[in-house]
């Protein structure tokens, strides 16, 4: 396992990339409404990243991915490909943004609701959000990856939901997906010991039904096997000398 420790200069570049990724999510919210296609949302984000931000959308052509963002609607767990699908009132959509600026990546996602959300969708999103933060709050030098996973898993399962196991968080920096893998389940005190200067994503995918998923024939889109809803939130996080720093906070939370 090759886990990179970021220098202070690299940490500053990660802060910039993280803020830009969060700014895209701040910007796109007003466009998430009935009748818009996921492809149109992708184009708006692409133009904003490449034009306004003078940055690079990391997903575009990454291992053959054809678009600049991921849009995962309702029972889509992750890596949904934007296209002709029109959003309708009641839909829940995760928008996942990764930008590259000055060689470094910032990666974050949020849930958005189209019109009035269903009660279960709103609750599922809230549990995913809370679980992400419970995991993040475990991060500090001397803590372990298993501390993050256990905190997330316990909270999700307490709510009678389930944690997806096939997909996880990851180290991030000059490379989109670096070591280590950040599992959203596990046992406290196990796994890699955290050190100051590590940067990684925490991004639990939480299913309303069972945890099992399947990959669609497009090779990217992951859906729940039981066709029930899924929700996800994601932040890029730096381990600091005293704890953690979230690099992808939206403007309202900075």
What are these regions (language model features)?
Residues 1-254:
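Active-site neighborhoods and metal-handling regions in enzymes and metal-associated proteins
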